């Protein structure tokens, strides 16, 4: 019974959808179709008659029609056996072989493929687009294998139709046609954005105002500069990384003392050497004690005489890191007044110092006296409490450790040792507790003696030749 229903369904589908079957059975009426069904049933089951149509009126009305119908059905379904099971298995095997072998097909093989499409049972596959794709494939000589394998879903069927229109074969061609636009978009080379001078100036100005811009501000800049918002976002990211690299590349004096680095950069920006104001992001009290020691002050004083003639002679060495203090620290009170304005008064000891060399020499003598007193265990000479600024940020352990280095450096300038001892007593009276430089906020200084560093020359320092180092007094 199931075989009969399947044959009826296949025959109805051929009458509705197959163009070849439509041509063959166009001259038959509904009764003729029923007669063909009856002939098919009688040929396979000769002992059983159809309950629907009697055999006598059928033969008297149609004459030779059953034999003709049986011939047509044999040619359609490739009937080679009388058993229905063998017929169905031969249909399935022929359909599978036709899927495996692409190439030119005969009419019978194409009809077998059509019957296999019917067995799939998806009504959406019989859309005009699917039939058009199949006809295009047959006309172009393409194989039906990929389209048959991709006919499980409507999407794959539409993909096969696109593939046949684009010259491909089957679902693979359709997927290539659909993915062609995406792959082409990915392969488009993205060139670098060429900013104009006005755009760069506006972006730099905005970066100096604020390193991180919000999205509404980025949108405003994009509208003002006629640039995409993502381009401005990427520019600010790159600019922040460039600024970070520049800060880290300045090996002096940032690793040793961030507070002094902040001081130098701020005053360089205030005088116009830097294009933007520098702001320290970490407070001074966050750092441990890495302040200027007595050895650094002695080294700074030794290079004070040659600072005017050759301010940036050679690159620094690890021991000569703070020799550059000689030039910008001709006014050491700027550091205290910069960090703690209004906390310090002018001592009388520093009132008569007017030049850069004499100021550095007196400061070095005071630092040497304070370090020697700290090394001997004596209390500091000053009476004021130490503050958290660079000049007052010192300890006895650092001073004791620096005394040996000061003695080693002082051996080069032994000729001026007597004068240094005399200056040490006067300079030590105005020094803070254990400090390298005195907190003199209002002492008169010459403006020409202070020259702040710029960002381009911060990696250089003053190193005096050996014959001029004995001009600055040093004490052991």
Swiss-Prot record:
Biased composition (Low complexity): 84-96, 147-159
Places the protein is found: Nucleus
Gene Ontology molecular function: DNA-binding transcription factor activity, RNA polymerase II-specific; RNA polymerase II cis-regulatory region sequence-specific DNA binding; sequence-specific double-stranded DNA binding
Keywords recorded for this protein, A-Z: Developmental protein, DNA-binding, Homeobox, Nucleus
Family matches, as CDD domains: homeodomain
Pfam families the record matches: Homeodomain
Family listed: Belongs to the even-skipped homeobox family.
Record's protein name: Homeobox even-skipped homolog protein 2
């Amino acid at each position: 019974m199931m075989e009969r229903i399947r044959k009826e369904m296949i025959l109805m589908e051929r009458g509705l959808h197959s163009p070849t079957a439509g041509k063959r059975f166009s001259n038959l009426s509904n009764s003729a179709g029923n007669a063909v069904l009856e002939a098919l049933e009688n040929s396979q089951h000769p002992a059983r008659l159809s309950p629907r149509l009697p055999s006598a009126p059928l033969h008297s009305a149609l004459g030779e029609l059953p034999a003709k119908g049986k011939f047509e059905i044999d040619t359609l379904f490739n009937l080679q056996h009388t058993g229905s099971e063998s017929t169905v298995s031969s249909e399935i095997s022929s359909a599978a072989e036709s899927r495996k072998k692409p190439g030119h097909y005969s009419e019978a093989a194409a009809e077998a493929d059509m019957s296999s499409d019917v067995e799939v049972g998806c009504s959406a596959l019989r859309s005009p687009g699917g039939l058009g794709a199949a006809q295009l494939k047959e006309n172009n000589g393409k194989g039906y294998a990929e389209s048959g394998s991709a006919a499980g879903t409507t999407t794959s069927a539409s993909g096969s139709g696109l593939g046949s229109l684009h010259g491909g074969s089957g679902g693979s061609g359709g997927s290539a046609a659909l993915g062609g636009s995406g792959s082409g978009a990915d392969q488009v080379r993205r060139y670098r954005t060429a900013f104009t001078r006005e755009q760069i100036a506006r972006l730099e100005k905005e970066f100096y105002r604020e390193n991180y811009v919000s999205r509404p501000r980025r949108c405003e800049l994009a509208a003002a500069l006629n640039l995409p918002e993502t381009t401005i976002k990427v520019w600010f990211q790159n600019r922040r990384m460039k600024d970070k690299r520049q800060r880290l590349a300045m090996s002096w004096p940032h690793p040793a003392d961030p507070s002094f680095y902040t001081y130098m950069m701020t005053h360089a920006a205030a005088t116009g050497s830097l294009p933007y104001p520098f702001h320290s992001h970490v407070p001074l009290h966050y750092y441990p004690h890495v302040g200027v020691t007595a050895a650094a002050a002695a080294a700074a004083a030794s290079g004070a005489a040659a600072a005017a003639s050759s301010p940036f002679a050679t690159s620094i060495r690890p021991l000569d890191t703070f020799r550059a203090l000689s030039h910008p620290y001709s006014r050491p009170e700027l550091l205290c007044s910069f960090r703690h304005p209004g906390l310090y008064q002018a001592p009388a000891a520093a009132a008569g110092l007017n030049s850069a060399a004499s100021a550095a020499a007196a400061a070095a003598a005071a630092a040497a006296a304070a370090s020697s007193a700290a090394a001997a265990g004596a209390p500091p000479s000053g009476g004021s409490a130490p503050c958290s600024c660079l000049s007052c940020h010192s300890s006895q352990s650092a001073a004791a450790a620096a005394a040996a280095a000061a003695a080693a450096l002082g051996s080069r300038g032994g000729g001026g040792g007597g004068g240094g001892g005399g200056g040490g007593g006067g300079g030590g009276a105005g020094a803070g507790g254990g400090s390298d430089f005195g907190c003199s906020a209002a002492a008169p200084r010459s403006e020409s003696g202070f020259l702040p560093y710029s960002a381009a020359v911060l990696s250089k320092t003053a190193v005096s030749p050996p014959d001029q180092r004995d001009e600055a007094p040093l004490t052991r």
